[in-house]
Amino acid sequence: MNGLIPTQNNDALAGVRNLFRHLMDAHVVEALYVPLETENSVITPALVTDPVYLERANPFAPAMPINGARAVAEITGKHAPAQIGVVLRSCELRALMDLIKLQQSSLEQLVLIGVDCPGTYEWAEYNRLQRDGGLSLDDYLAAGSRGENLASPALRVACQMCNQPVPEPADIRLHIFGADLSQGIPITVEDGIASILELEPVEVSGADGRQAVVDRVIAQRDQVRQREFAAMRQRLDAKDGFAEIFSTCIRCHNCKTACPICYCKTCLFCTASFDHEPEHYITTARRKGAMRMLSDTLLFHLTRLNHMSLSCVSCGMCTTACPAEIPVGMVFSVIGADVQAAFEYRPGRDLSEPLPLVTFQADEWEEVGEKRK
């Protein structure tokens, strides 16, 4: 059902906070996972059970501390302990879908609330804009509704080239693209939830222009995506390109921690398997003439690529987390896109679509061997 959240004095944030309170008051959800804004304007994800805290909810803030799929997987496990609503961006929803396929989360007792995403800033830039008074949420939403500046260099690179900015699938979708937010916030609500909330269908003025704005945003970002991919492929194709890109890796494993798909409770690279004896280093250095330090960094990233590339949603959180400013996310996005194309798979597209590596088709990959008669 299509509806409209009324706004107070053109305040979209107040309108969406009222919706969240309504969801809790009507017992559609018992708890809500949503970004909260502290008194110092810091955005932090939180699981809210007391509606009082929803006065701080800000799902529109252009900041992304974590990919929320990680938190949702922790909150729900295989069986959510309560009816929980989760407010997520598109890349977070898509990551969650693949985590569900990997049996790390469940849709049981989960209400998915998706928000159109005009893009987010790196933390340092977001904090600077907040501190200097250069970030107006109203202006940000207005630009998003018109589809303007959504490939701006000020945004995170992952957002500049994101060509899937609309949250799907979701039980409730909050529309920004193409919306006249002075009228209210257009929403799409699953019929059962709409009935509980006693919402009435509303014909939204200008709704026909939404798809045009979405198409324009995707076209802008596809241009950035093609340019960035071409530059990264050139670096990867160069002699020792992969090793050169990761040459400054300090083996902190931040990228692993930030990745929503990297879910192993005990990572091989955090075990004693890679705690080498001192003799190992001198022996290896003598054999090769020189040994890269810290050791095993390339093996770490190659292993993650092998595990993650099919489900990489290009959220870019690994790049954000890297203290050495290595473009980890760009490497994974480029290689992930090639792997996903080879298997005709797109992460998060369809929950019923199985992960390629857990399926078998007798007639696939015939080019790597002779077809049996």
Regions found by a protein language model. Give the residues of each.
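Iron-sulfur-associated redox domains of electron-transfer enzymes in respiratory
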Residues: M1-F242
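Short charge-dense sequence patches
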Residues: A14-L19, T44-A46, A207-V213, P260, ...
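Residue-level marker for well-ordered alpha-helical positions
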Residues: R17-N18, A243, H253, N306
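Local cysteine-cluster metal-coordination motifs and their immediate loop/turn environment
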Residues: R89-R94, A154-P167, S247-L268, S309-E325
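Ferredoxin-type iron-sulfur electron-transfer modules in oxidoreductases and energy-metabolism complexes
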Residues: R221-S247, C264-K373
